[in-house]
Amino acid sequence: MVEQDPFEIAVKQLERAAQHMKISEEALEFLKRPQRIVEVTIPVEMDDGSVKVFTGFRVQYNWARGPTKGGIRWHPEETLSTVKALAAWMTWKTAVMDLPYGGGKGGIIVDPKKLSDREKERLARGYIRAVYDIISPYEDIPAPDVYTNPQIMAWMMDEYETIARRKTPAFGIITGKPLSIGGSLGRNEATARGASYTIREAAKVLGWDGLKGKTIAIQGYGNAGYYLAKIMSEDYGMKVVAVSDSKGGIYNPDGLNADEVLKWKREHGSVKDFPGATNISNEELLELDVDVLAPAAIEEVITKKNADNIKAKIVAEVANGPVTPEADEILFEKGILQIPDFLCNAGGVTVSYFEWVQNITGYYWTLEEVRERLDKKMTKAFYDVYNTAKEKNIHMRDAAYVVAVQRVYQAMLDRGWVKH
């Protein structure tokens, strides 16, 4: 369970990064606040003829480096604080990847499991009508997130085009779309594919002779967890010895087959009881003696309580915020190489950027081209962060913040928004 206010955590992380760089007080004060917060009311006609009123948000955190970019979350416990924090993190994520974007995030307080498809469509279109004036391919570009998907993006794009009375490049108004209407190849696997490149480079800086035969444990078997298991085993020859979902995990020292585990999970609702594997708890998975640990589920799973028991040499944060600030210190002292979340999982937003570029230019790339360009972007970002960490003798998360905040600060200086 998340105990701290998400936006307070985001501000604390920013303040901590500021200690390792030269930044004016006024700029820091500016960066602690979103540039725009919009709250909207969305009336939706339900299938029974009644009207239900929903609350939605869109936060545009900082647009010094370009149009704001970030997903739209549908969650029964959505809060403005969470949306603000995620918009701040998107600002740093796009900056660390050196994408020409700022950071944004959207959310609607709703339990989508209680809505029919027709009700979901009406809610999606209603949200776009409500935020139409503040989004565009050149101002703020939404994408899928928690409980939203390509179908919802398609309805949203269609509504935007209907109001705007124009077609392409309005395609670029939203990313994460179905392939039939301007989506990009490689988007499904993007988060895991990007993470795999950072794990590969982390192994190099640790002096490993490749990843073949090395072991990995993955907490979380959703989209990112499954693709990471598949990519690390099939493309890099790693042994995926453990995976888990919210109900528990499985362990097999000889390795697990990603596709077979996925099939089992779909048929039985969980990876648990997979033939030939031993059931383990999520807590046990985190403390396994493996080469790489990839938390790919929820936030705050490695804390000061269990950080001392982590045995992996590399912790690849595929999830958002899986390691608490106190645990960061412990892992750093233990000499564990951490790949911080907004670097490790930035493959998703990077391929979203590629999708937008393809929409704007009207020229579409092959899967090989998408992967090759993603590899270049992720590898450069990894070394930007790693070299900063080495140079300043700070851990990777602080270094990622320093790289990102410095880039946003420079853009603000160049625009004349703040002074040195």
UniProtKB/Swiss-Prot annotation:
<dbReference type="GO" id="GO:0004352">
    <property type="term" value="F:glutamate dehydrogenase (NAD+) activity"/>
</dbReference>
<dbReference type="InterPro" id="IPR046346">
    <property type="entry name" value="Aminoacid_DH-like_N_sf"/>
</dbReference>
<dbReference type="InterPro" id="IPR014362">
    <property type="entry name" value="Glu_DH"/>
</dbReference>
<dbReference type="InterPro" id="IPR033524">
    <property type="entry name" value="Glu/Leu/Phe/Val_DH_AS"/>
</dbReference>
<protein>
    <recommendedName>
        <fullName>Glutamate dehydrogenase</fullName>
        <ecNumber>1.4.1.3</ecNumber>
    </recommendedName>
</protein>
<comment type="subunit">
    <text>Homohexamer.</text>
</comment>
<dbReference type="InterPro" id="IPR006096">
    <property type="entry name" value="Glu/Leu/Phe/Val/Trp_DH_C"/>
</dbReference>
<dbReference type="GO" id="GO:0005737">
    <property type="term" value="C:cytoplasm"/>
</dbReference>
<dbReference type="InterPro" id="IPR006097">
    <property type="entry name" value="Glu/Leu/Phe/Val/Trp_DH_dimer"/>
</dbReference>
<keyword id="KW-0963">Cytoplasm</keyword>
<dbReference type="InterPro" id="IPR006095">
    <property type="entry name" value="Glu/Leu/Phe/Val/Trp_DH"/>
</dbReference>
<dbReference type="InterPro" id="IPR036291">
    <property type="entry name" value="NAD(P)-bd_dom_sf"/>
</dbReference>
<dbReference type="Pfam" id="PF02812">
    <property type="entry name" value="ELFV_dehydrog_N"/>
</dbReference>
<feature type="binding site">
    <location>
        <begin position="220"/>
        <end position="226"/>
    </location>
    <ligand>
        <name>NAD(+)</name>
    </ligand>
</feature>
<keyword id="KW-0520">NAD</keyword>
<dbReference type="GO" id="GO:0004354">
    <property type="term" value="F:glutamate dehydrogenase (NADP+) activity"/>
</dbReference>
<dbReference type="InterPro" id="IPR053388">
    <property type="entry name" value="GLPV_dehydrogenases"/>
</dbReference>
<comment type="similarity">
    <text>Belongs to the Glu/Leu/Phe/Val dehydrogenases family.</text>
</comment>
<keyword id="KW-0521">NADP</keyword>
<dbReference type="GO" id="GO:0006538">
    <property type="term" value="P:glutamate catabolic process"/>
</dbReference>
<dbReference type="Pfam" id="PF00208">
    <property type="entry name" value="ELFV_dehydrog"/>
</dbReference>
<feature type="active site">
    <location>
        <position position="105"/>
    </location>
</feature>
<dbReference type="InterPro" id="IPR033922">
    <property type="entry name" value="NAD_bind_Glu_DH"/>
</dbReference>
<keyword id="KW-0560">Oxidoreductase</keyword>
